[in-house]
Amino acid sequence: MKKIVKSIMSRDSGSNLPLQKKMALDYINSVRKNSKVAFYQPTYNPNNFELYRINEVVRKTTDMRVDTIISQFDFNFINSYLDIGSQFGYFVFKLAEAKKLIACGMEMDKVLYAYSNAIVILNDLENVSFVNCKLTPEKTKKLPKYDLIGFLNVFHHIVHFDGFDAADEIMRTLFDKCNYFVFETGQYDEKGYYWTEDLKFMGGDSNLWVRNYLINLGYKILHIENFGTHLSEGTRSFVCCAKD
């Protein structure tokens, strides 16, 4: 009983917070109360604030992805990180925490962008930032260089909405913007989604297509894991790359 009470008391409800932090916590919880928002990532909560609802999906595989990045890259050569399609910012926060990086997230959804910034304010975080932006070939060319870029589960959406040529141009430009790259995408073997048929160019072996595509761009494959998603029983290739 004492342990339960201690656990409850250790969570900060925000009642004694400065106004800026209270507003940030209120915003975070207002988003979490919205049933239309799907939590595909955990919420970074290092100070154990009291957050509404805990039914975040795929937490285990999200943390496994983060751990794979940390274990497969040599961070003696990595000081900066860009996460394209950062959602709730979890990869940005965890890599900045683990490796003391200058880390930036790019997110086109204004709600998720604001959510990530609220986490920054609430926890007094430094060396992390977020930008609200939909990536296009033109905007990609204007990006600064980063040591490591994460492009996770965005490629297939660009293919669907803007076409393969646009997605391919973005990928080729990103090659020039980084030294290390981590990639994951929806695959043609995931049937029944609005983007599935747009990926038919992947052919009968989506994992092989992803591998060969990255090699043809000029990357050296360092490591490939296969992780599940909330969408299907199948897995996606999670590929860690370096400039060859």
Regions found by a protein language model. Give the residues of each.
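Conserved alpha-helix/loop element of class I SAM-dependent methyltransferases that forms part
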Residues: 58-77
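Conserved class I S-adenosyl-L-methionine
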Residues: 77-87
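Glycine-rich SAM-binding Motif I of class I
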Residues: 89-93
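Conserved SAM-binding motif I beta-strand of class I
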Residues: 102-107
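Conserved SAM-binding loop
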Residues: 116-117
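A conserved beta-strand element that flanks and buttresses the S-adenosyl-L-methionine
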Residues: 150
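A short, conserved alpha-helix within the catalytic core of class I
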Residues: 158-173
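Conserved beta-strand signature within the Rossmann-like core of class I S-adenosyl-L-methionine
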Residues: 177-189
